[in-house]
Amino acid sequence: MMDTTSERKSKSDFSYHIFLFPFQWDFKKEGKPLENMGFLERTLLDNMGALLDKSCWEREYFTVGHPIKFNEYIYFYDFVRGALYDSREKPTDILHQYNYLLSENPRYIIYIKNKKEPYDLKIERIQLNLYTTGVGILSFHLSNQSYSELKQILEINEFGRRIYPQFLAEGVFTEITKESFLADQLQIRIDENREFHDDFSYFNNIERVQENPSRLSAVIMNLLGNPFMTHKPLDKKNCVLISPILDDRMFVLCWFADRKLCSRLAVYNKDKETYRYEEDDDWYKLVFIEKSSPSCNSVTMKKQLLLEHTYDRWIGKKDSSLFGITRYSFIMLNDEQSTFVKDHLKTMYLQMVQLALVQRASVLRFSHEATRIASLETPGDTSGKVRELYEKYLQFVNKIYFREITAQEQGIDLYECIHQVLKLERDVKELDREIDELHQYASLCEDRRKNKQLHILTVLGALFIIPAFLTGFFGLSIFTADLGLTNKPLYLIMTIDIILIAVLSGFWVKAGKKWKIFLSIIILILIVFMLVLPFLGIDSTAPGVVP
């Protein structure tokens, strides 16, 4: 998983890049419409593992078998580790981790329009994390040993992270996008027999785009395999529907070693009491992933943004480091001799960022589910759906959403910075309000259902209360010969009378005021008739009466 010490000494990385693709997923069972499947059934982790190609993906269980892994493991609180590691010894129902099986020299190649040579980076690892909240993260871990200039690093980050066009221009479709943001072609070469690429030409046919506008890069879809789709399948096979949580950009983690740039940004002006980085365009472009000029023209706003998104605890000293954190990036710039910091990016800081992204993705996923349940035309088993969602939400709050994950001072600061830029505390509070309102809505639906059942019972009670009263009035003796109920004509008349009283009583419950008066008179007449009927002395031997 990690480079050994000897490997680090024999290699010199100018930069290290990790692209994170957060997405939401739904397992669709064969022969069962997705709309009819509950949230728990759609997010079972075991179903996902069964669909991954075993010849390409391998389950990864974390073990403390190397000093770097040990350093990473003890960095976090014990109660947090269940959301970070897939352990065989301590299995959890939170996370499953998979590694893509790579050859000796896999490559991540970025072709840029009007540029002769592509950027060719070594793939160290491709990892897939799947979480019980119905979200996942696909990550590409890339080593750069060939490109040292800032301009090259900016282009790698900008063009390497795009998974579909940001926009389509009328008539030329992806041409303008490729000049600014989108790679002309992305290619992953695993070995001679496995090579995935995408030139995004799919989006040059608007009729085809209309059929599936949410299509993701073919590079990602080919890595995941055939069971993974971005649109509902026509067949009935088991499959997984996925969609991006963010937009056309993957999240970027980048470590970059540049002594000159780092020293320049660390210059402190005692008169102004400011660092150079606070107004530096290069630092702005590196932090906000912009390859040419800063998109912010305002000098004051640019300075404010850099102050808000820069963590400078270790600036100006030996092994100087500068951190930039935004909603789409986590950047580490340091002296080129401080290569040990790269291992921090690949371990502790990666785990921090992944956890925060999972938290954000889960919040968005829960909000989507809450909206879906609330918008159902026929509530159906609303309380059951809300109960499933609430169960997952409690699991999320207790096992994934943490306000603090380490006792290390710098780790506490960085984690707080990540939470602030992602606005997680605000979003979790808003989600809590949404789910509370949904719970109230479900309770209202449940109360209505119970009231309806109670109303039915009331009607049934009204149907039988008068016959029960009459039966009690006459006592068991009405079935004896003394009252003549052995007389079949009399018995038949009384039965009809009881049925009429019961039916009219049912109508009386739902009737309006005027009808209730009319029905009350009719029912009263029938009751009086019922009371005097046994004493009328109808003869069973009368002509036409069969004894």
Describe each model-derived feature in a short phrase.
Residues 143-145, 336, 401:
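An acidic- and aromatic-residue-enriched active-site/binding cleft used to recognize and process polar
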Residues 31, 49, 187, 266, ...:
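Short, flexible coil/linker elements and helix-boundary hinge sites characteristic
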Residues 1-277, 546:
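N-terminal pre-transmembrane cytosolic regions of membrane proteins
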Residues 3, 7-12, 425-426, 430-547:
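Hydrophobic alpha-helical transmembrane segments and their immediately adjacent juxtamembrane loops
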Residues 345-484:
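Membrane-associated alpha-helical segments
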Residues 146-163, 364, 368, 375-382, ...:
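Intrinsic-disorder/low-complexity, polar/charged segments
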Residues 250-375:
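N-terminal extramembrane/targeting module of integral membrane proteins
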